Amino acid sequence: AHDIAAELWEQGAKNVTMIQRSPTTVTRSSTLLDLQTIGNFSEQAVQSGITVDIADLIVASNHYKTVHLDGQKSVQLLKNIDKEFYQKLASSGFLFDFGEDESGLSIKYLRRGSGYYIDVGGSELIINGDINLESPAEIDEFTEKSIFLNNGKEIDCDLVVFATGYGSMNQWAAKLISQEIADKVGKCWGLGSGTRKDPGPWEGELRNMWKPTNQTSLWFHGGNLAQARHYSKYLALQLKARYEELPINIYGIPVVNHLS
């Protein structure tokens, strides 16, 4: 939503308005980059012999049960580094949070894959008033040339863009294959943390990612660049072993606790 609104404003659209329904976790891109280049992904790490592959392995070795603790530490750093930014964002009326347990954007990404924004300028436009904001609000009614919000406001508009969140992988599986297969596989992504949009029980790993599923020959690959870089190797090895008809011991096919 931020990027669409910012692009419309940059192209000269007048009276761009964002309608925010619920809080969003916001982290500035520059700050996120600074924090992520501390330690294993820093120039100092490279000089000490820690390659990208080694750094990826170190990150992947962290147990998902405790990664939120690191996230909480990062949030405290974020709040101090960007204190003025968050104060201005709050004053603009934009609703934001740092996750249900203050563990931040990265953990929310692992748990639900939505509800966050890596800020590359959209927030500044909201703070400056270049992008109008209605928050919290939802659309109650459309007319020929306007919308009515649930707060009673009417907004004249020539264009309405729905930026209503990310679709899940199993929703795409249902569209591409069938609802039956999607339900057979079950929910993809998330850890079973018991937080919003990531229902329990605890899974221990990301659901149905890079491993055998309940549907033979159906695999799911996704994530950010770092995850794609790292886990694609293990997915490729599993596929190669099957093509070569090598004997394979599987820890266990995921139990389906939630349908797609």
Descriptions of predicted regions:
Residues 25-69:
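A catalytic-pocket lid/entrance helix-loop region that shapes and gates access to the active site
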